[in-house]
Amino acid sequence: METFLFTSESVNEGHPDKLCDQISDAVLDACLEQDPDSKVACETCTKTNMVMVFGEITTKATIDYEKIVRDTCRSIGFISDDVGLDADKCKVLVNIEQQSPDIAQGVHGHFTKRPEDIGAGDQGHMFGYATDETPELMPLSHVLATKIGARLTEVRKNGTCRWLRPDGKTQVTVEYYNDNGAMVPVRVHTVLISTQHDETVTNDEIARDLKEHVIKPIIPEKYLDDKTIFHLNPSGRFVIGGPHGDAGLTGRKIIIDTYGGWGAHGGGAFSGKDPTKVDRSGAYIVRQAAKSVVANGMARRALVQVSYAIGVPEPLSVFVDTYGTGLIPDKEILKIVKETFDFRPGMMTINLDLKRGGNGRFQKTAAYGHFGRDDPDFTWEVVKPLKWDKPQA
């Protein structure tokens, strides 16, 4: 059996780029909660002792940007300079302007257009992906890297590993074989964890705790063997982290946000963007489409692409590739997808309920992935029934 190795990485909620994603989406949540028609393009950057929020926002909501920044930093665990940032003492800069009227008239006609006539907020192409290798219909390498990162945060916050600090990165290499286009995991080849820690813990303690409390509960035993390689804090020291260690910026972890390098990516980031931005809403609808194709048994693996022009409601193109795993031709699956899913931005917003803020809805997406999550707020993860005739064996 010929196999190959594929690697996916993830980062924790305390990584500087992810901190910025979460702040941008916390701002979006606050705007949508008060004004569902808010137009939000919110960016965040951070470095030592400083967070800046900037961008274009048009909303009727009253937003305390500084409070959102400090609350988000605090909830992640940035409560002192020792851990990389002090939520209560850091400098917060705000530079928010209104959305360009040129963009506004082209996209939503200053709220005069019907939902089905609302144009895309920009040009671009987005991809959705699904694979039957996990219950989430997501790539195993990505799922494991993401869940290990989430587990690091869990054992830090519940006190299991008191030496942990907020920043951290994970990476998992999986050995696969290609079953006529479908990806079948064989084993976990390598696990890499680099996590921020305090001054008191030894490298031996770090390795022991990570294996026992992080890796063991997450990676199924069937994927581990005596050949699995573990790199646990291989640099030897990771005390300085968060914004003190590295600058952070919204939208720099787009592969971590999606499929861990599998499928494809059109390049557009998600966080801080309202649903008229098809970078986000378009990526959500094609994930639902790809997932529905696989969940309905039409294929074991699927990639769906959609593309847009600014101000134009109808997509320019829709594409489906099942990597040779489809039970019916891809062109027939494409026809079913186009009949089932409405790719117009205004209709995607309604069908996926993307104007609803609150409950930290979009902030939740900004750490540990936008896809493959079992959460009712992730409406794009709901499988739609597809009408098709399964070929007779």
UniProtKB/Swiss-Prot annotation:
Cofactor dependence: Mn(2+); Mg(2+); Co(2+); K(+)
UniProt-annotated binding residues for K(+): E43
Regulation: Inhibited by 5,5'-dithiobis-2-nitrobenzoic acid (DTNB) and N-ethylmaleimide (NEM) (in vitro).
The entry's keywords: ATP-binding, Cobalt, Cytoplasm, Magnesium, Metal-binding, Nucleotide-binding, One-carbon metabolism, Potassium, Transferase
Origin: domain of life: Eukaryota
SUPFAM superfamilies: S-adenosylmethionine synthetase
PROSITE patterns: ADOMET_SYNTHASE_1, ADOMET_SYNTHASE_2
Protein location: Cytoplasm
Chain positions recorded as ATP binding sites: H15, D167, G168, K169, S235, G236, R237, F238, D246, R252, K253, A269, K273, K277
Any GO BP annotation: one-carbon metabolic process
Binding site for L-methionine: E56, Q99, D246, K277
Chief location: cytoplasm
GO cellular component: cytosol; extracellular exosome; nucleolus; plant-type cell wall; plasmodesma
Bound cofactor: record note: Binds 2 divalent ions per subunit. The metal ions interact primarily with the substrate. Can utilize magnesium, manganese or cobalt (in vitro). Binds 1 potassium ion per subunit. The potassium ion interacts primarily with the substrate.
Binding site for Mg(2+): E9
Tissue: Highly expressed in stems and roots. Detected in trichomes (at the protein level).
Entry EC number(s): 2.5.1.6
Swiss-Prot/TrEMBL catalytic activity: L-methionine + ATP + H2O = S-adenosyl-L-methionine + phosphate + diphosphate
InterPro entries given in the database record: ADOMET_SYNTHASE_CS (IPR022631), S-AdoMet_synt_C (IPR022630), S-AdoMet_synt_central (IPR022629), S-AdoMet_synt_N (IPR022628), S-AdoMet_synthetase (IPR002133), S-AdoMet_synthetase_sfam (IPR022636)
Pathway: Amino-acid biosynthesis; S-adenosyl-L-methionine biosynthesis; S-adenosyl-L-methionine from L-methionine: step 1/1
GO molecular function, one term: methionine adenosyltransferase activity
Family of this protein: Belongs to the AdoMet synthase family.
Function: Catalyzes the formation of S-adenosylmethionine from methionine and ATP. The reaction comprises two steps that are both catalyzed by the same enzyme: formation of S-adenosylmethionine (AdoMet) and triphosphate, and subsequent hydrolysis of the triphosphate.
Subunit structure: Homotetramer. Interacts with GRF3.
Protein name per Swiss-Prot or TrEMBL: S-adenosylmethionine synthase 2
Organism: Arabidopsis thaliana
Lineage of the species this protein comes from: Eukaryota, Viridiplantae, Streptophyta, Embryophyta, Tracheophyta
Gene this protein is translated from: SAM2
